Structure formats: structure tokens, C-alpha cells
Curated annotation (Swiss-Prot):
Attaches a formyl group to the free amino group of methionyl-tRNA(fMet). The formyl group appears to play a dual role in the initiator identity of N-formylmethionyl-tRNA by promoting its recognition by IF2 and preventing the misappropriation of this tRNA by the elongation apparatus. It comes from Serratia proteamaculans (strain 568). GO terms for molecular function: methionyl-tRNA formyltransferase activity. InterPro entries: Fmt, Formyl_trans_C, Formyl_trans_C_sf, Formyl_transf_N, Formyl_transf_N_sf, Formyl_transferase-like_C_sf, Met-tRNA-FMT_C, Met-tRNA-FMT_N. This is Methionyl-tRNA formyltransferase.
Length: 314
């Protein structure tokens, strides 16, 4: 293609691999792929390559896996490729200023939110957690800050009432490559525009923790239902009963208020296990006891009905 760019791609998980896949058929020249070192995974803790490495090797692309880009000898790996631009998608390593400045057109990043909202590690999950009605992807020119660079392209996406982090991840994994290719086309043609982020609109998407996934019945049912969707597929919301954790994969909000303390079981049948909250009732419909697969409320009641006697407290 005319205006073909020499591109370094840097990314690690499946989300990044979908962007590399789009680049492979774009006509641009991929001169190198950076991804995190192989990690132990699975029951045998066998060293496992990242999805980006697997795809890159299938297409015989040079792969680099430094543990850090701070040492000068690792920075030379980038410089020696003489790239026009570096595309960074969920790479997981910090790029020092020296590296950001090496490609002729700098480095661009695909971020899973409409910046400046939700800078940081968990933008997809936090948009659900906060009850946002819209999210999207932002392509930005990278600088040394945390997602602070100038914005070059945005694509918005509605958040549906039944979206989970898994479903939203899939939507953004389709939008991201579109935005990336559009931005690269504009950069190649010299028509790319840059918009400074409005610092007054910044919010931060803190990393998720397993502790945060514990359901706090002193919150409103609406907020707890958002947590269930935001923490699916990880770390998965849960409560404990008889000192055993029970994960909650799906839940709905019942608008009526219960005349009971938060955490009290109101009713349990095939339609769900109803629990009182600070405001409204949370109806648990898909659950997973320790050591079992996710199951319907009915299946759990068949084996553990004594746990969910109305009046019991979770």
C-alpha cells in the first residue's frame, strides 16, 4: 500500500493479539513484536507464551521479550528496528521517554475507555462498576504519564444493561483495531489530529482486587448488581456462608424494599435467591460454590437448601 509504515507492535494478552491480527492484513510493515516474557500457566505451571507471541511466530515476525525496557541494551532493540511508529496495546511494561521518542512518529496506544475518563489499569471494569451508559476506545499519542497523552481518535460504544466485563471486552476488541487502523492511515498521510485531554474530567480506573469482589450487602442492590457484572470474569463477586465462598456470576435487581437487615435471605426458589440490601433486593441467579462449576439457583438449592432458608444472614 502507499503510505505504508514501518511498525513495531507491543502487546501481550488476547485483546492485543486481535489488534496485531488486524495489522497483519493492513499493508503496513511489522518490523518487530514486543511482548512480555513467557509465564508459568495451567496446572503444570508450564512456561506459556502470550497470545501475541503465538500469533507473531505463526507469521514469522521477529519477537522480543525483554523483562524491562529501562536497560539501554534493551532500548537498542527498539532503536535498531528503525520504526516509523510503535503501536502499544496492553503491553504491560512501562516505556521510558527514550523509547517513546525512538520511532519517527512516536508511540500510540489503544486504551479501553473514552479518555480522559478511566485512565489506568481497569477501564472496562470500572465503567461497568460506576454505572456508565457509554464507553469506547481512545487512540492516543503516548507520553511519560499514565494515559495522559493527546487523543487522536475515539470510537464510542453503548453499555447495555446486561453487559459484563467479558462482553464489553469483546466489543472493544472489535472497535480498537478499527480506531488503530484509522489513526495509522492518518499518520501515514500526515493528516492526524491531536486533542489535549481535559484534566478536569479525569477519573482513574484502579486495578481490581479479590477483596473488592466480596459483596457488601450494606450497598444498594443496583450497585451490587453492577459489581457482579464488572467482576465477571475476574475476580468474580462472592459471599461466604459456613465459611465457604460462593461466587455470584449473575444477579438481577428487584425494586421492592425488604423489611430486613442487609444480607438477610428473603426468599429462595428456582427464579433466584433473594437477599436484602441497603436499598432493594438482589436476586442471585447463577452461583458457584467452592470446587463446583457455575450453576443455576435451582441446582444450588437442590444440594444446599439449608444454606438459603429465609431469615438466614449471609
Amino acid at each position: 500500500m502507499s503510505d505504508s509504515l514501518r511498525i513495531i507492535f507491543a502487546g501481550t494478552p488476547d485483546f492485543a493479539a486481535r489488534h496485531l491480527d488486524a495489522l497483519l492484513s493492513s499493508g503496513h510493515q511489522i518490523v518487530g513484536v514486543f511482548t512480555q516474557p513467557d509465564r508459568p500457566a495451567g496446572r503444570g505451571n508450564k512456561l506459556t507464551p502470550s497470545p501475541v507471541k503465538v500469533l507473531a511466530e505463526q507469521h514469522h515476525l521477529p519477537v522480543f521479550q525483554p523483562k524491562s525496557l529501562r536497560p539501554e541494551e534493551n532500548q537498542h532493540l527498539v532503536a535498531d528496528l528503525n520504526a516509523d511508529v510503535m503501536v502499544v496495546v496492553a503491553y504491560g511494561l512501562i516505556l521510558p521517554k527514550a523509547v517513546l521518542d525512538m520511532p519517527r512518529l512516536g508511540c500510540i496506544n489503544v486504551h479501553g475507555s473514552l479518555l480522559p475518563r478511566w485512565r489506568g489499569a481497569a477501564p472496562i471494569q470500572r465503567s461497568l462498576w460506576a454505572g456508565d451508559h457509554e464507553t469506547g476506545v481512545t487512540i492516543m499519542q503516548m507520553d511519560v504519564g499514565l494515559d495522559t497523552g493527546d487523543m487522536m481518535h475515539k470510537i464510542a460504544c453503548p453499555i447495555e444493561a446486561d453487559d459484563t466485563s467479558a462482553s464489553l471486552y469483546d466489543k472493544l476488541a472489535q472497535l480498537g483495531p478499527q480506531g488503530m487502523l484509522t489513526t495509522l492511515q492518518q499518520m501515514a498521510a500526515g493528516t492526524a489530529k491531536r486533542e489535549v485531554q481535559d484534566e478536569s474530567l479525569v477519573t482513574y480506573a484502579e486495578k481490581l482486587s479479590k477483596e473488592e469482589a466480596r459483596l457488601d450487602w450494606n450497598l444498594p442492590a443496583v450497585q451490587l448488581e453492577r459489581c457482579v457484572r464488572a467482576f465477571n470474569p475476574w475476580p468474580v463477586s462472592y459471599f461466604t456462608i459456613d465459611d465457604q465462598p460462593v461466587k455470584v456470576w449473575q444477579a438481577t435487581v428487584l425494586a421492592q424494599n425488604a423489611d430486613a437487615e442487609p444480607g438477610t435471605i428473603i426468599h429462595a426458589d428456582k427464579h433466584g435467591i433473594q437477599v436484602a440490601t441497603a436499598e432493594g433486593i438482589l436476586n442471585l441467579t447463577q452461583l458457584q460454590p467452592a470446587g463446583k462449576k457455575p450453576m443455576s439457583a435451582q441446582d444450588l438449592l437442590n444440594s444446599r437448601r439449608e444454606w438459603f432458608t429465609p431469615g438466614n444472614r449471609l
